[in-house]
Amino acid sequence: MGDKILREHLLNLLSGRGAHVDWKDSFSGIPAKLRGIRPNGFPHSIWELVEHMRIAQRDILEFSRNAKHVSPEWPEGYWPSAQAPPNAKEWEKSLKSFAQDLGAMKKLVANSKTNLYAKIPHGTGQTILREALLVADHNAYHLGQVIAIRHILGNWR
């Protein structure tokens, strides 16, 4: 049995199951005209959040599996320069990249050869378990912001 149950729980958490809305539902049906709006009181648009999530998730994934990875400069390297996507193609490209990286993190977690508890050799004490939880937590936080913005803009259920 080992850590099979823990891996299943992590995969569910990364997938947004349970108490969370999954990322696909969070980003589905957002008209292009709303993607770059910063509602009153919100510091970011949906596009900025999507890109921030993509960039941060990629950084965490690459840190987890690549000793030569260099993280972006904090904080500016983790946020897009534009408030809105330049076009629909870039929006779709960002979502596709987000999905691929999330899938790669899930694959890393699901692989029984991945030691979830071992310290990442090039880190400062981090483990794959910690990095997977960080991805899930970070995504859940910002997906909540996306849904809040969608509510304010009248674009949520």
Predicted regions and their residues:
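Short, contiguous alpha-helical
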Residues: 3-20, 24-27, 32-80, 120-157
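Acidic/histidine-rich alpha-helical segments that form the ligand environment
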Residues: 82-119, 130-135
